């Protein structure tokens, strides 16, 4: 076997490989002889079929198999001989495969870069810490009390905020009743904003038995596209009005929600408020870490990975209205530069984290995959069981989660064992503003 290196620069390795015709012919002859002992051909006993007959029947397929094996063997030999850390499948070009000539071909391989892990202990980040106060907890208790109000007392007074109103309604657009515009015995809490914006407010001041004309405009993003943005008039019959009995927030109230006391329910809400912000904090912390890493990394990345990531980004933007709006006023040159920079960042950080996980011998556990599946499910409120069933019944989809799961594990390990974290305290209101600002920023990265 002859090997001529054509290119060994950066992350590209190209070589021309040749195998003498005599070696190919020897391999073919051995294979044909072996087949004479196995094949069944009419008119011949097994093991007594002439080579010429076997060659006539199987010669082409045998040659193709031998060529494929020789190519694979030669490529693997080059990889081992030159200690190449390749990515993807080698590309075979300029194949010379005539039956009377030596086997020759060019192999092109893309290499993974040599990655030096930076000193992560030099990185420091602020970690937001939510300080839940009594006001935050009391607001949650009030919301819970409002949701569980008992509307048993019928009222003949004028409708006011907080009343439960039972209505019949027929909707008209340009004086024509429209499909799905009818409500029967529909109960709505005034001020809950359960109906189209402005609908509930126009019922205030009316009484049981009265008829009210309600004029509204369907939101532009209304789920029924044929109604979105259109003006409508509803003829509403007020059938009943009920006021809520006052809710006393005490130990008895708490017991309705599997708590032994009001204090225990308060503790539950404190933890719930803390947990609600934890996922958003972790996402932002991860992006802040990536910001730091991006400045430390300058190695070349494989072109194939870069192109793959750019295609993923473009596909994602096409489906995401928020991302699309960020780029709508940009020139094609600016959009290309944006994708190039973001793809380079993601590929570099992904390769670094894979190398870091390898250096620390981090292994995926079932819990790691469960966490990623839970994160996916939270993106589809109300469809969680469908997401769980999808991954349960699709092993290949689970395989696709292993990369992100290992990346998350590496990031968590870095947070716990490498970088310096400084706790920064926020009130609930301050944290919400911070998270909102950060979430807008990270949509760009």
UniProtKB/Swiss-Prot annotation:
Alphabetical list of PROSITE patterns matching this protein: FKBP_PPIASE (PS50059)
Domain PPIase FKBP-type: 162-247
Source domain of life: Bacteria
Reaction(s) this enzyme catalyzes, per UniProt: [protein]-peptidylproline (omega=180) = [protein]-peptidylproline (omega=0)
Annotated function: Involved in protein export. Acts as a chaperone by maintaining the newly synthesized protein in an open conformation. Functions as a peptidyl-prolyl cis-trans isomerase.
Protein source organism: Rickettsia africae (strain ESF-5)
Family according to the record: Belongs to the FKBP-type PPIase family. Tig subfamily.
Encoding gene per record: tig
Domain notes: Consists of 3 domains; the N-terminus binds the ribosome, the middle domain has PPIase activity, while the C-terminus has intrinsic chaperone activity on its own.
Protein name (database record): Trigger factor
């Amino acid at each position: 076997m002859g090997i001529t290196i054509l290119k060994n620069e950066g992350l590209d390795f190209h070589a021309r490989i040749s195998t003498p015709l005599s070696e190919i012919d020897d391999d073919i002859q051995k294979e044909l002889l072996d087949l004479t002992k196995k094949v069944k051909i009419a008119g011949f006993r097994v093991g007594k079929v002439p080579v010429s007959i076997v060659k006539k029947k199987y010669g082409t397929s045998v040659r193709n198999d031998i060529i494929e094996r020789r190519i694979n063997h030669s490529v693997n030999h080059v990889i081992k001989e030159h200690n190449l850390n390749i990515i993807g499948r080698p590309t075979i070009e300029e194949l010379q495969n005539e039956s009377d000539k030596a086997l020759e071909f060019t192999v092109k391989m893309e290499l993974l870069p040599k990655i030096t892990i930076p000193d992560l202990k030099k990185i420091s980040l602020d970690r937001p810490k939510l300080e839940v106060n009594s006001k935050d907890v009391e607001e949650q208790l009030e919301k819970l009390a409002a949701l569980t109000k008992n509307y048993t007392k019928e009222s003949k007074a004028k409708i006011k905020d907080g009343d439960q109103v039972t209505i019949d309604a027929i909707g008209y657009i340009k004086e024509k009743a429209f499909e799905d515009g009818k409500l029967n015995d529909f109960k709505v809490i005034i001020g809950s904003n359960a109906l189209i914006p402005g609908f509930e407010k126009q019922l205030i001041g009316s009484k049981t038995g009265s008829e009210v004309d309600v004029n509204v405009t369907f939101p532009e993003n209304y789920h029924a596209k044929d109604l979105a943005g259109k003006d409508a008039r509803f003829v509403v019959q007020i059938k009943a009005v009920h006021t809520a009995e006052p809710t006393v927030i005490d130990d008895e109230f708490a017991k309705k929600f599997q708590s032994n006391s009001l204090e225990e329910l308060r503790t539950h809400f404190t933890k719930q408020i803390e947990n609600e912000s934890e996922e958003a904090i972790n996402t932002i912390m991860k992006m802040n870490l990536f910001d730091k890493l991006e400045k430390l990394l300058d190695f070349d990345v494989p072109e194939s990975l870069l192109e793959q990531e750019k295609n993923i980004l473009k596909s994602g933007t096409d489906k995401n209205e928020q991302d699309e709006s960020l780029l709508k006023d940009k020139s094609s040159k600016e959009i290309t530069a944006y994708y190039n920079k973001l793809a380079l960042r993601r590929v570099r950080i992904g390769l670094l984290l894979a190398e870091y996980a390898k250096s620390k011998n981090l292994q995926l556990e079932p819990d790691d995959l469960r966490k990623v599946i839970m994160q996916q499910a939270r993106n589809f409120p109300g469809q969680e069981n469908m997401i769980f069933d999808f991954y349960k019944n699709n092993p290949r989809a689970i395989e696709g989660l292993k990369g992100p799961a290992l990346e998350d594990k590496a990031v968590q390990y870095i947070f716990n064992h490498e970088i310096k974290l400084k706790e920064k305290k926020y009130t609930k209101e301050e944290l919400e503003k911070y998270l909102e600002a950060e979430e807008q920023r990270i949509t760009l990265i």
